Amino acid sequence: MHDSFLSANGGFVVSKKTPHGLRLKHLGIKTYHEAIIYMREDCHVCHSEGFEVQTRIQVTLGSRSIIATLNVVTSELLQPGEAGLSDYAWESLHAKEGDEIQVSHPKPLESLSYVHAKIYGNELSFEQMKVIIDDVLSGRLSDVQISAFLAASGAGRLTRTEVMKLTKAMIDSGDRLSWPSPLVVDKHCVGGLPGNRTTLIVVPIVASFGLMIPKTSSRAITSPAGTADTMETLAPVHLSPQKMRQVVEQENGCIVWGGAVSLSPADDVLIRVERAIDLDSEGQLVASILSKKIATGATHAVIDIPVGPTAKVRNQSMALLLKQSLEEVGNELGLVVRALFTDGSQPVGHGIGPSLEARDVLAVLQGLPDAPNDLRERALTLAGAALECSSKVPPGLGKSIATQLLESGQAFKKFQAICEAQGGMRELTKARFTYPVVAAKEGKVSLIDNRKLAKIAKLAGAPKSKSAGIDLHAHVGESVEQGEPLFTIHSESLGELHYACDLLRDKQDIIILGENP
């Protein structure tokens, strides 16, 4: 509604719009990071303001304010005069049951005009990118509006200059760490490969050499395990920025969950929306990786790019473009990037899922005879590249030095010290239920579908159930006999085990066997 009055000369004047008040009811609805407001279909505010389903509404409680998307309730869930909020919106406003909120139309968003400009192919300035990223982070742009920006930025529509501007805007959206050492190394994998948990081996190797490597890692969103999920089976990863700094200064390295420290927080929102629309854009990927590395305070970064038909990067031409973008944009922003191509044709190691991957990591660090050699070699290659960032390590000798640090036990000792500094080393758990999947015939493994195997591990309960996942027994190029296990599904519940087995009946081409020569 409006406050209105007659002016001295008899004219009708409309003054500032008065927000409407509604009483809050806690509904307990989770929408992840999306702010939703729930109002009755017959709500007087909806009628007077013209609010409809999906309308963006300014919601104010005291000094706090958010923009939320309207969902309309047609049942008696809400009483007249009441409104509900999603848990994310509730927490953002620090709301309590019975609080009165004010609702009104928000001001037009400047950022939305820049999103439209990008849709029509215009190049955006740094200031325009910054306005978009600020509105992404504050929640003023809805998920639908963010997805429009992501789609407009995909398929090579961002110029190299725009990628640099986007990266810088994302860095500026959060905190930026600084360290006393002039050389700070970081390591990252672009993803798409189950079991590729090299970080937990690379960090202690590099730290035991004396280089600083403060590693922030993500949790899984669509994969069976993120690095943070796997590390969490062995030590706490939810550290405050102060505790993280203490661990790094004490041990030269850490492996913590990046969500606990505010480094490029806008990237987390963009990733969430990207996953929902299944969109992978080279420009967004470069900005995502580099913004996190630079915000962590790194001066040098080693980037692992697995290349394979069912990996995130499917072929060599895509890999070359990504490598060039990472190195050029990194250089423009003062970060030395070394991108390495690795085999992405099949999972790394045996385990897929937090505890099973952690078991493989410990086997490599301890030099056990059953340690997966592919995980060991990949980790040594990446650790060697990281060591060569130091002037103390001649080019080409990094891997041999990394091997010495691993085989001498120094790396495992450092890993134990990092775990203790982060809160104490934990014992791994084992799943209650297992189901072996056997070869229907004899033959040689010719192909493994990374995505389908990862999906089975997720249906089995990973990463929520730390011990759930898959134990892979056969790799590409290996011969198997009829009836020999190809992989074993691990699950904490029979229900989830049955879900995973149901997918097996529909997907018979997860592991393809060719004829033995």
Curated annotation (Swiss-Prot):
It comes from the Bacteria. One of its GO terms (cellular component) is cytosol. Gene3D superfamilies: 1.20.970.50, 2.40.40.20, Nucleoside phosphorylase/phosphoribosyltransferase catalytic domain, Pyrimidine nucleoside phosphorylase-like, C-terminal domain. GO terms for molecular function: 1,4-alpha-oligoglucan phosphorylase activity; thymidine phosphorylase activity. Transmembrane segments: none annotated. Its EC number is 2.4.2.4. It holds the Pfam family Glycos_trans_3N. Signal peptide: none annotated. This is Putative thymidine phosphorylase. It comes from Legionella pneumophila subsp. pneumophila (strain Philadelphia 1 / ATCC 33152 / DSM 7513). The lineage of its organism: Bacteria, Pseudomonadati, Pseudomonadota, Gammaproteobacteria, Legionellales.
